[in-house]
Every structure is written in structure tokens, then in C-alpha cells.
């Protein structure tokens, strides 16, 4: 702590990112990265930007990327916002759309741990709504005064999916609140809520290119919703950083959306590997929650989760252990290649 800090800084509880180990030999199954590389066409497009044009600023509106997203989802570019990773997009949403006096912001008690961090940063009152015994969202629990609602779908870190019909029920019950569906993992088994944005002006859907499109190192995220909501995010962005995406990010992300064949192929590989891993872990006595993500959430009835994680690490396999409350005995395990998954099973 320094005497030069603004007063609120000492009260912040920052987000703790997942470990990024330096040893290349480790089997890394802790941060939900895609085990398959980016689209070769996207890599080629990014390499094409390594020229004298790097002396020039990128397009502040990222029009090439917005057009690619709009065409992919059947919306207009005016309904698309892009930013430097979905975390930045979410930060702008919290800053620009959730500061109201109608009640607290609502989100699940087991959810993305960045949400309370944003609330602390922007001074937003919030309430964590308890998931049921199966770690599922109950729509009726969100029928109370609120400043907005946000939840991951599929949820993180559980992987559980809220069906699109239930998402629509939530929207209908909260027409005067912004409802944000955080779809970081939607491509591994869910149906996007983007199909609902033309019917609900209170819906905002966020996505990332870090998971299903294998571009975690590029830092690109997006939001799709009513143009009025997008305008609010643009106003926040242009009051903070008018150039959030560089030239390589814009073109690489755009081509990643355009290369549908590669996207479909790699998503299918992850989904197939997930089902094989779930079956193998279940046979070893683990309880595995239903997952629609590129990870699974599992516990063993007779083995301590922290102990399992430590033993795996000793054998060169890293998984994520959350120590808090009702999930303290669960491990979150990223779906790797078949070889990576087998290394996990061998280590167990």
C-alpha cells in the first residue's frame, strides 16, 4: 500500500487468473484453452498484417470483424460490439449498464469469479443467487427487483447449461432490466441466445474467441444486442481506449469466424473427447456434472480434491481446484486432446 493510492484501491479484491506455468512439459488442463490451434486461415491472415502498415493505427471501429460476426449470426453490425477480450467487454457492461438504484445486480453464487471483482471496482451492489442442489439456475429466483442480471451459459466453473427456453423466461420476467448471457463456452454444446436479440431489447450476449476459436493469446471478445445497448458500450470504450484491437486481432478474428469448417471440426473433437473423458472418470468413481463446455467439473466421494490436484501436479498434470464453499471438493478439468486426457487418466 502506498500513500499515493486513491482511497478505493486498498479495498479492491482483484481477480486471480489461472496459473500459466512456465514448464513446457506439463499437461495443462487448468485454464480451458482449446487444445487445437487457431484456424490456419486466420494465422495466415494475421501474418499478412506483418508489414509497414503496423506504423498506422488500426480501425477504431473494427468494422471488418463486426461485419464477420454480423454475417455469422445473422444480425447487423450495429448490433455488434468488440473489445480486447470478453473480460474488457464485460467490464464496459458493468460500468455502463449495471449502475442503477432499482436493486442489486443478480448473478449465481457459483459463477465467474470476475463478476464480484467488477462490482468492487465500479461500486455496484450485488446479490449472489444460490444455485439449486444440482448446481442449476432456477429462473424463479431472479424474479425480484434488480439492477440487472448476468450469468455464464454454460455456467463456469460447473459447465451446466440453462436451456434457451429458460433464458427467454428470464428475459420475459425482467423486461426492465438488462440481462447479460455470458456465452464463453456456448459452442461446445449449447444454443446461443443471439437468436433472441431482435425480440428482447434488454438482452446482451457476450462471447470470446479464446475458447472455441483457439485465440486466447489474441484477446478478442464481443457482445451482440440491441443497438441502444451497443451504443452505450461504444461510449464507454471511446472514453477509455478507442483502439482496443490491433490490426492482427481484427483480421485474425474475422477470418476465424469465416472459417466455419475448421471451427466445426475442432469443436466436434473437443465434444467427442469430453464424452470419452466423462465416461472414463465415471468408471473411476468420480461424480461428473453434466457439461456443455470444454471442461468438466468433477469430484470423488472418497478422495479430497486438493489432494488429487496435488498428486496430479506431481505427475505433471495441472487442473483447477476451487477452495470456496460448496465447490471445495470439485476439480475443473479442461478437455485436452485424447493424448492429454489419457495422461490425466494415467496420473489418476
From Swiss-Prot:
Designated gene of the protein: hisC
Name of the top EC class for this enzyme: transferase
Organism the protein comes from: Pseudomonas entomophila (strain L48)
Metabolic or biological pathway: Amino-acid biosynthesis; L-histidine biosynthesis; L-histidine from 5-phospho-alpha-D-ribose 1-diphosphate: step 7/9
Residues the record lists as N6-(pyridoxal phosphate)lysine modifications: 211
Entry's family note: Belongs to the class-II pyridoxal-phosphate-dependent aminotransferase family. Histidinol-phosphate aminotransferase subfamily.
Molecular function terms, GO-annotated: histidinol-phosphate transaminase activity; pyridoxal phosphate binding
CDD domains in alphabetical order: AAT_like
Assembly notes: Homodimer.
UniProt EC number: 2.6.1.9
Protein name: Histidinol-phosphate aminotransferase
PANTHER family on file: HISTIDINOL-PHOSPHATE AMINOTRANSFERASE (PTHR43643:SF3), HISTIDINOL-PHOSPHATE AMINOTRANSFERASE 2 (PTHR43643)
Catalytic activity, reaction form: L-histidinol phosphate + 2-oxoglutarate = 3-(imidazol-4-yl)-2-oxopropyl phosphate + L-glutamate
InterPro entries named among the record's database cross-references: Aminotrans_II_pyridoxalP_BS, Aminotransferase_I/II_large, HisP_aminotrans, HistidinolP_aminotransfase, PyrdxlP-dep_Trfase, PyrdxlP-dep_Trfase_major, PyrdxlP-dep_Trfase_small
GO biological process, one term: L-histidine biosynthetic process
Cofactor(s) listed in the protein's UniProt record: pyridoxal 5'-phosphate
This protein's UniProt keywords: Amino-acid biosynthesis, Aminotransferase, Histidine biosynthesis, Pyridoxal phosphate, Transferase
Pfam families given in the database record: Aminotran_1_2
